[in-house]
Amino acid sequence: IISEDGIVVTNNHVIEGADEITVILNDETEFTAELLGRDPKADIAVLKIDPKNKKLTYVGWGDSDKMRVGDWSIAIGNPLGLGGTVTAGIISAISRDLGSGPYVKFLQTDASINRGNSGGPLFNLDGEVIGINTAIVSQTGGSIGLGFAIPANSAKKIVQQLKDFGKTKRGWLGVQIQPVTKDFAE
């Protein structure tokens, strides 16, 4: 939850194909969520819950560009249904390309991230969200210290567009680069 009025950020793959989305808080309060927008290419979705008279606790964005290899990171999630699980590690790499497209370069962390952590926050030691936990690389299916998060600075821009327009607007340049052969040059 990133605002007191009930804006929720998660991964697109968490909500993809859902007919109904329910957000469950730590105190077991349940809210039906409205999908404001999603970006499958960046794997981000923005939801809205109506807090009614409930005061929501929310988190703030940090500056992911300030993170350096070796900085501490803290992941919170719901791995295997174990809600509120907190793990810690370090930033292992920045701007990691996983080959999933040109839109996001990931923060890599060795904080334990497992199935169920997707869409959860990756924090710095100041309690600011520096990333959205998104993926792991593992041959066993469990965490082996190769976790990846969408950097907050990338996510913030996408989240704002999803809130404003329901989709992400990207520029596109219709240019194709190819070698100039002798025949083509003539």
Question: Language model features by range: what are they?
Answer:
Residues 1-186:
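Serine-dependent protease modules
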